[in-house]
Amino acid sequence: KEGKNFIPITQTWPADLETPLSTWLKLSEKDSHGVFLESVEGGESLGRWSVVATKPLWEAVCCGKEIVKTWNNGKTEIHTGDPFDILRTWTKEYKSSMINDLPSIGQLYGSWGYELINKIEPSVPINEIQEKNIPYGSWMFFDQLVVFDQIKRCITAVVYADTSSLKDSSLDEVYLKSISKIQKTRNLMKVPLKEYEFLDWNENENLNLDLKSNWKKKDFEEAVLSAK
């Protein structure tokens, strides 16, 4: 479509012999960086959609005052500023379109800690970040996804073809490359699921943990009384 540079290429097939969990276990076996998301209705009932994604195009991690972007080829970029503004700038580069029969699934997934609430609500006080090497925000941007439709019992593999720097003569090559990625995903899903050993639960096991409180007992008791 005109003005689009991140074109979704899809294939759909029956999901009779697969589940979202089995797919996640197969696709994430050699790449643990990914997401497995389930939609939920009313906070209780399992929803219609499940999304499995591995091998992010790039990852972004906030540490201290920096946000580090790491591409899937190992190249890194270091930026400073508001992480949300930076993420908006990065994602604006990708102009895509909705996919028929699929919800607006997005491609940027991640999590962030309390330290970033100040970027949204400046009046909320936060403590100065002490550990500069501990991430307080982490995101992954995907150009390939697997989407389960629990009602129609079908799987849709999505690969986004980047046409931003291509000429018309190379569009066929990009399309075939996207189809090849989908086929690799399907081949991985055909592999039998390996056996997993479950951990034995021992409720009587005693662990010797070296714990040290960062509160004095007196201060803790006073805080409890104040909360009451």
Question: What kind of region is each of these model predictions?
Answer:
Residues 106-115:
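Conserved phosphate/anionic-ligand binding catalytic regions in large, soluble enzymes, centered on
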Residues 83-98, 122-133:
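Short acidic (Asp/Glu) patches
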Residues 1-34, 39-77, 114, 118-228:
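Extended accessory regions or peripheral subdomains of proteins
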